[in-house]
Structure formats: structure tokens, C-alpha cells
């Protein structure tokens, strides 16, 4: 999988990464198990090959990155044959693969430095001194130039 250019290009977007941080790994993996049970476990899943959205949840992106998104990918990349209901060991294998990928993304995000803080410039107002924010009456508004 790591040699596949298609699979390597997947990364968590900012919304999915925030969701993972907010909900936590345990909750997201519980979602993964639910998705696997409903969308992949049946012998003939509904809309097989199209049942996993491309974005919107960290698990969806992880499924595409780990080739656990449909039964044909499971067969080709994970060696799990089509045509039978997934057993407990196969389901656990899929969720574990998703978890490893999510953990690698979480660690990748921690290793990167946050971008520098953006400075916000005050708009130029003719006749006002932007450096002097103390007004004559003791307020905090800009004072007109004399």
C-alpha cells in the first residue's frame, strides 16, 4: 500500500483532523467498526465500490488510504475474499488498519509546526493616528490628528 501513489496521497483534511481531536481515537474507531459492520461486512454490500464517501469523516479517508473502502479493494490489497460475510477477525483487522493509519496521521500532524500567527493590520484612516489609541476622554478609540 505504501508504494501505491494513489493510496499515499490521502491525508486528513483540517476538518477531519479537528473531528479526530475533538471526539478522540476511541470514538472514531467505534464509528469505524459501525461503518465496517454496516457497509463492508455483508457478503454482497449495497453499492459495493461506491459505499464509502471520499470525505466528511476521518474513517472514510482512512478507508481509502488503507484499501478498506470496498470488497474489491479488500480482496486485492488485504487478501479478504469477496462473497462471504466478514468474520470477527476480518472486521478487527480492518478496524486495526484504519486505526494505524489515523494514528500515523495524528502523529504526522503533531510533528509539523503550527503556522506563524497572522498579523492583522488596522486599516488606514486619514486624519487618525493609528499608533495612538488613547482618546482625549480616556477611552480607547483612535484620536484625530491635531
Question: What are these regions, as identified by a protein language model?
Answer:
Residues 47-67:
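Immediate flanking context of iron-sulfur cluster ligation sites
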Residues 72-92:
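Iron-sulfur (Fe-S) cluster-binding segments and ferredoxin-like electron-carrier domains
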Residues 106-131, 137-146:
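Short flanking/linker segments adjacent to small metal-binding domains or redox-active Cys/His motifs
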Amino acid at each position: 500500500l505504501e508504494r501505491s501513489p494513489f493510496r499515499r496521497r490521502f491525508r486528513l483534511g483540517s476538518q477531519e483532523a479537528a473531528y479526530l481531536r475533538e471526539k478522540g481515537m476511541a470514538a472514531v474507531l467505534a464509528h469505524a467498526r459501525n461503518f465496517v459492520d454496516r457497509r463492508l461486512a455483508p457478503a454482497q454490500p449495497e453499492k459495493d465500490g461506491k459505499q464509502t464517501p471520499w470525505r466528511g469523516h476521518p474513517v472514510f479517508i482512512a478507508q481509502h488510504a488503507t484499501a478498506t473502502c470496498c470488497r474489491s479493494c479488500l480482496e486485492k490489497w488485504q487478501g479478504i475474499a469477496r462473497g462471504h460475510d466478514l468474520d470477527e477477525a476480518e472486521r478487527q483487522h480492518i478496524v486495526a488498519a484504519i486505526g494505524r493509519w489515523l494514528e500515523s496521521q495524528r502523529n504526522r500532524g503533531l510533528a509539523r509546526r503550527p503556522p506563524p500567527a497572522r498579523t492583522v493590520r488596522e486599516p488606514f484612516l486619514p486624519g487618525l493616528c493609528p499608533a495612538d489609541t488613547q482618546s482625549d476622554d480616556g477611552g480607547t478609540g483612535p484620536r484625530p490628528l491635531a
